[in-house]
């Protein structure tokens, strides 16, 4: 991802396209409005911002739910490839998956999540706020970055659609369809096993990751609109 990427996502509530930097504040307005419109709500929910460079998720987690629910969600949308182990960390210490959110989370708290202890994918989490809102879902997706405009590292003109997992280092290994065909002639590994799709996840190009199982409409390559 060496070209200048624009990271933005669509708000679940109003459908507006909002930049990564502004999304937390934007969602807060909607959540405060929900809280004010339902003053008798008893449930506690937490707005959590999950980030890996230009890729991000904003989710609303139910206080009664556990870290196991968020782990399952992250696996389905960003991580799962071969059933690797995963772990949440708070100030460097492990957080048990059975711990409930309302036992741990407070506004401003920062955590980390690690998937796969070999070819590791690490993301950061920050609790943006807590609200009195009744919610059925354990984890509700509020926003996710749209697919990033990752350019081919060979021609630097067309959008990349494939990755060579052997050559994916510092600005290399991303190919458009035409350049991927040429790279296949030069790289036996690419034709054999190293060709992988560009997907909207920080796990792309790693291990056997081929894409998520939920929110699949935003899991592909960038399309100009």
Tell where the protein language model's regions lie, with residue ranges.
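Short linear regulatory motifs enriched in tryptophan with gly/pro/ser
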Residues: 1-225
């Amino acid at each position: 991802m060496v070209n200048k990427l624009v990271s933005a996502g669509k708000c679940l509530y109003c459908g507006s396209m909002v930049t990564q930097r502004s999304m937390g504040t934007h969602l807060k307005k909607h959540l405060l409005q929900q809280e004010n419109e339902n003053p008798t709500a008893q449930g506690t929910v937490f707005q959590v911002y999950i980030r890996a460079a230009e890729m991000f998720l904003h989710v609303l987690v139910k206080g009664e739910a556990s870290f196991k629910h968020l782990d399952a969600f992250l696996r389905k949308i960003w991580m799962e490839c071969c059933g690797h182990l995963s772990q949440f960390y708070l100030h460097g210490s492990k957080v048990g998956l059975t711990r409930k959110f309302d036992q741990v989370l407070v506004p401003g708290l920062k955590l980390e999540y690690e998937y796969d202890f070999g070819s590791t994918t690490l993301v950061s989490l920050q609790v943006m706020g807590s609200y009195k809102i009744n919610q059925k879902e354990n984890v509700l997706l509020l926003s996710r970055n749209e697919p990033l405009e990752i350019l081919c590292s060979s021609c630097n003109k067309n959008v990349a659609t494939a990755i060579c997992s052997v050559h994916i280092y510092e600005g290399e290994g991303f190919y458009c369809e035409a350049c991927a065909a040429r790279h296949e002639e030069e790289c036996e590994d690419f034709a054999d096993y190293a060709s992988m799709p560009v997907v909207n996840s920080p796990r792309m190009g790693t291990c056997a990751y081929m894409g998520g199982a939920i929110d699949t409409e935003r899991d592909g390559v960038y399309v100009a609109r």
